[in-house]
Every structure is written in structure tokens, then in C-alpha cells.
Amino acid sequence: MEASPVPSSQGSQLDSLLGRELLARLLQVSAVSLRRYLAGERAVPDPVAARLHFLALVAGDLAGAYNDIGVRRWFDRPRTLLDGRSPAELLEAEWKPEDPGPRRVRDLAGALVWSPAT
């Protein structure tokens, strides 16, 4: 799962979970482009597919600790472990999953899988 992005299925699931506006913002694409990707009207560029897969993994980690509303809010809430920044703030322009900011976001979400408390 870690290295197998499937934009069509992950995109529709994340769109349903996060909502079009938040998902487009996190992917750093316009809502119109996202709609076209999800409808299959336009091919998903590789960098966007990688971001989509990354967000699906993060959302999967969060699902064990938060309900759908909590998952959506998690991305915009400042976190002490992120130096007071929100996860969305660390997903900076043209981010790649292997960049330091996104790695910190993934590590924080992944830590919830092992935490007995939220």
C-alpha cells in the first residue's frame, strides 16, 4: 500500500472524507482541476498522484483516532509537535511526500496509530 498510488479510488475516497475544497488545497490544485481528475476527464499528473497517495496514508492513520470531522479539522489545527504550525502549513508549494515538512506530518499522524490516547 505504501508505494502504490491509485488516484481514481483514493481521490474519490478522500474527496468524500475531506471535501473538495480542503482536498484541492492540500493537493495544491484548483477545485476545477480536482473535479476533472476525479471525473476521469483529465489524467492525474504524477506529482499530484503522489500527494494524493500520501494524503490517503495520513487519513488512514488518522481514522483510528478521529471521526470524519476530526480528520478534516486535524489538517488545519496548529500542533505543538509541528512547532505551532498546522499540518496543512507544512504541505508547502509543490510539496513532495519525501520533503521534510510532509514527513513530519506523516510521522505525527502515524504516531496516533500507536498512541493509546488521542
Segments the model singles out, each with a brief description of its role:
Residues 1-118:
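Non-transmembrane "mature" sequence context
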